[in-house]
Amino acid sequence: AGIRQIRSGRARPGIKALIEVAGLDDLVLTTQQIAFNIAPRLNAAGRLDDMSLGVECLLAPVHSAVEQAQTLDALNQERRRIEKEMGQQALEWLPDLAAESVEDLFSVCLFDPRWHEGVIGVLAARVRAQCARPVFIFTEVDGALLKGSGRSIDGLHLRDLLVEVDRDCQGLLQKFGGHAMAAGVTIQKRDFEVFRDRLNEFAGVQLKGRSLDETVISDGLPLAFDLVTVAGLVRDHPWGQGFPAPVFDERLEVLEQKLLAGGHLRLKLLSPRFDQVLEGIFFNRDRMIESRSAHFVFKLDVNRFRGVDRPQLVITHCL
């Protein structure tokens, strides 16, 4: 009902202002655009400043909504800059980690005192995607304490893993909490190596002998790439948590590609099956596709640019 209200033009002023600063059209807004364009602007307030700024924007009257949305947009741009810088630093360390015995590396812990506390969770998710192992990213919160944010992989309950570490090494964890896929922990700075080693040890108990290669599940080949089919799939179905949008895969030819300022890759692709040129966006991809064709995994979306709707592939993997 909420997205129908937005599409009918009856959204609150703050929501309309957020849609405007994101460069979107409220009349054809999709759940994916809410997740990837609107929500990050709201979340940026809590990550870098005060989460109440997001609430105030949502409740804002007409006369102040645009200004508050612009404040959130500026915070989100700063968050993206910080995230990109931290990501480059963290990913530079991964080749060294990969050089260690793969058989003995079941988790990854990284620490840098310069990393922003509000962005370490996002960074943990990015590193996890690169190494296919549970990851904790730490930063310094004062002279003696480190705060860490973790992200896990399917089949390994991260909070339960911390419970085992805490039971084995009483006093190591100052505090911790979370759930299966994400957790937070505070430790003494002097205990970083001990935590790293114990986490790896207990993760190994559960993961030893199991393939750590990421499993990518697809619904198969799309029936078509035409606008009517894609728009019906995107706009007329209640995709969300517990009911995810379908994921497709297909080998496509790479015609053009361009790295965008935000650390994303925009592509022009050709489907030999339909002899159709397609637009694609690969979020958080900071390097080109090296081959002239590749096997892509993607979701379908509708991209509106200057009032014209076009089908778009939102790429998640290049195999």
Could you tell me what each predicted segment is?
Residues A65-Q70, A74-L110, G143, L156, ...:
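Mid-to-C-terminal polyanion-binding domains and interfaces
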Residues A1-D191, P222-A224:
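Hydrophobic helix-and-loop "lid/oligomerization" segment in the mid-to-C-terminal part
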